[in-house]
Amino acid sequence: MQVILLERVAKLGQMGEVVDVKPGYARNFLLPQGKALSASKANIEAFEQQKAQLEARNLETRKEAEALAAKLDGQQFIVIRSASDSGALYGSVTTRDAAEAATEAGFTVDRKQVVLSPIKELGLHAVQVVLHPEVDATIHLNVARSVEEAELQASGKSIQELAAEEEAAAEFEIQELFDDIGAAASEDEELAETAGVAPAEPSEEDDSAKA
């Protein structure tokens, strides 16, 4: 099926180009999204008449997208989720979650603009946001079980490193506990030995009685 593009479509073509696409792709995506028209003679003529207006509108929306991209690109957003000790999420982080995280931080992002396969592990994840057919930005989702964990991940530590540190800290606390118990036992033994080898000396009254 031939369509005429009303805007740039990635891997397909630029505005005004007539391209061949699968009928299902045209009917289910390009046409309802307003990205193309069927390439009939009437539609091609109508496009040529409106071309200048469409190009002006495209230029305006591209400038707006570029301004947003300049602020959005490189931003990091925290998403709190429950997960196992190995870092596997109980559920997933989706395009909706990414859009909501950006929106809560003050950016206008629609889930349809987010290019993302569901995230199923803790960690930092780069996510593409298509703000305009010719403009995109990359954000980072910091998926963690707590804000504290997110801050550690942001410093460059992986979930494996965090788990290893927690395990080492737990082992250290256990060792300290055993050391304290051992030290207390040694003190008790010393006190017992001292009591056994150092009997009380006779008082002056006892010496007078013997005399």
Curated annotation (Swiss-Prot):
PROSITE patterns: RIBOSOMAL_L9. GO terms for molecular function: rRNA binding; structural constituent of ribosome. Transmembrane segments: none annotated. Disulfide bonds: none annotated. GO terms for biological process: translation. It comes from the Bacteria. GO terms for cellular component: ribonucleoprotein complex; ribosome. Residues 183-211 are annotated as: Disordered. The keyword Protein biosynthesis does not apply. Binds to the 23S rRNA. Belongs to the bacterial ribosomal protein bL9 family. This is Large ribosomal subunit protein bL9. It comes from Roseobacter denitrificans (strain ATCC 33942 / OCh 114).
